[in-house]
Regions:
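Alpha/beta-hydrolase active-site loop
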Residues: 122-144, 301
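A glycine/proline-hinged amphipathic helix-loop "lid/cap" segment
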Residues: 1-68, 310-313
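Alpha/beta hydrolase fold serine-hydrolase catalytic domain that processes acyl esters and thioesters
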Residues: 150, 165-313
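Short beta-strand element of the alpha/beta-hydrolase
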Residues: 76-86
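Gly/Ser-rich "nucleophile elbow"/oxyanion-hole loop immediately N-terminal to the catalytic nucleophile
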Residues: 139-154, 174
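Short amphipathic alpha-helix adjacent to the substrate-entry channel of hydrolases
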Residues: 94-114
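Short beta-strand-to-loop junctions in surface cap/lid or active-site-entrance loops
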Residues: 58-60, 66-76, 233-238
């Protein structure tokens, strides 16, 4: 399918206004540019869950900023944890705010969006350590937050999808964490950058291969890019992982590694579902102001997470 016209215009506008590549800019400017990108014209107007509260979650190196979203104050919903994208170097709970509001309303889950330490100031394994610490704390403190006690749904997009996948893998041997299912949105799964979809050009996608290469160098200083702690695609054992929903996009350099991971999970006996959205780009679920598929993803997530909880959408 052809690239969605609204997304094609978005890419053209980005290219026309790019004066320097990210690695040529101060990291503060990179982060500001990412914040400024998410305008209401792209994200859509923010819906209003009844409850939106900023939190601080204990982390391994100090408190982690987080935000709780609940569609109703008078109901204890299950917890869904969300880790934002941004290539490990940018992004945060503010950039994902509109999406998490939509997610809480559609899924009838209490969504907790968690910040983690960013590279290059805090390289690997800081983000993994923060994700694990937050999942462990939330697994045992749902009641304090007014949510339903029970196993979590772990979710994330892009770099955050990587953190969710790695945390789910670690949780199998960590009794502090109870994970019911995982929702991975265009997740980073292969630091070797070797899948065929990496050939997509900058005029076809929002995150070309050279941007990914820079993100990975900022985050991970190790020589083994097949380490399961950064590349879940190369994990030697995937058995026993929680059920997974993996969402990919046709015009995304990460598309094929997502498809490969689905096959590996299926071979390991994991319940997994995957949808590749035609005509879409990386991060499209955040772009409700541009494409209707953004809401389709939220509804797909709601259908995936709710049967196991007995909640009717």
């Amino acid at each position: 399918m052809a690239l969605d016209p609204a997304l094609h215009r978005l890419i053209e506008d980005k290219l026309a206004h790019t004066r320097a590549r990210q690695w040529e800019m101060p990291i503060a400017d990179v982060r500001k540019g990412f914040r400024d990108f998410w305008t209401p014209a792209i994200t859509g107007q923010p819906p209003a869950p009844e409850r939106v509260e900023d939190l601080t979650i204990p982390g391994p190196a100090g408190g982690l900023r987080a935000r709780l979203y609940a569609s109703r104050r008078d109901r204890r919903d299950p917890l869904l944890v969300f880790y934002h994208g941004g290539g490990y170097v940018k992004g945060g709970i503010d950039e994902s705010d509109v999406f998490c509001r939509r997610l809480a309303i559609a899924t009838r889950h209490a969504v907790v969006s968690v910040d983690y330490r960013l590279a290059p100031e805090y390289p690997f394994p800081a983000a993994v350590d923060d994700a694990i610490a937050s999942a462990a704390w939330l697994s045992s403190h749902a009641n304090e937050l007014g949510a339903r006690t029970g196993p979590l749904v772990l979710s994330g997009e892009s770099a955050g999808g990587n953190l969710a996948a790695v945390t789910c893998s670690r949780a199998r041997a960590d009794s502090r964490m109870a994970i019911r299912s995982q929702v991975l949105l265009q997740p980073v799964l292969d630091f070797t950058l070797s899948c065929a979809s990496m050939a997509l050009s900058a005029s076809e996608c929002l995150v070309p291969r050279d941007d990914l290469e820079w993100y990975y160098r900022m985050y991970y200083g190790g020589s083994d890019r097949k380490s399961p702690d950064v590349s879940p695609l190369f994990a030697p054992d995937l058995a026993g992982l929680p059920a997974a929903l993996i969402v990919t996009a046709e015009y995304d350099t990460l598309r094929d590694e997502g498809a490969k991971y689905v096959g590996l999970l299926q071979s390991a006996g994991v319940d997994v579902r995957c949808t590749c959205y035609p005509g879409m780009v990386h991060g499209f679920q955040q772009m409700a102001g541009l494409v209707t598929a953004a809401q389709d993803v939220v509804e797909e997530i709601a259908a995936f997470v709710n049967p196991a909880t007995g909640i009717a959408v």
